[in-house]
């Protein structure tokens, strides 16, 4: 579960902009990298401390807190580089498509 939390913080830190729940689901489900229920549990576990969740037009949108950014910088390297790169590429695709 901690690796999923780190992955979410790393995604938000790397892309530099907030992502909504559906975007996070789509990005992390690439090649079934993260189970949906594990992602939901991880989001619940980091909301408030490592990231904030605000509703925009009724949609939950996540962004890192300072602690979330620090966690991404400090622990992001614990994630395999191939996973970080794939998730970042997918995040850019999803974010630019939806904006």
For the regions a language model picked out, list residue spans one by one:
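Short amphipathic alpha-helical interaction segments
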Residues: 33-48
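Short, amphipathic alpha-helical interaction segments positioned at domain boundaries
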Residues: 66-98
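Short capping segments at the starts of secondary-structure elements
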Residues: 13-20, 34
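Minor-groove-contacting beta-hairpin "wing" of winged helix-turn-helix DNA-binding domains
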Residues: 58-65
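Short alpha-helical segments that sit at the start of domains
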Residues: 1-15
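Short acidic, hydrophobic short linear motifs in intrinsically disordered regions
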Residues: 18-28
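A short, conserved structural fragment
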Residues: 47-57
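Contiguous, well-ordered alpha-helical segments that form the cores/surfaces of helical PPI scaffolds
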Residues: 6-10, 26, 44
């Amino acid at each position: 579960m901690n690796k999923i939390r780190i992955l979410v913080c790393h995604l938000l830190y790397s892309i530099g902009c907030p992502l909504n729940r559906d975007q996070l689901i789509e990005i992390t489900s690439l090649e079934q990298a993260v189970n949906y229920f594990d992602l939901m549990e991880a989001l619940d576990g980091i909301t408030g401390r490592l990231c904030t969740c605000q509703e925009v037009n009724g949609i939950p949108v996540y962004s890192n807190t300072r602690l979330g950014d620090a966690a991404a910088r400090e622990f992001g390297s614990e994630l395999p580089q191939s996973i970080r790169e794939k998730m970042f590429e997918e995040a850019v695709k999803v974010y630019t498509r939806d904006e």
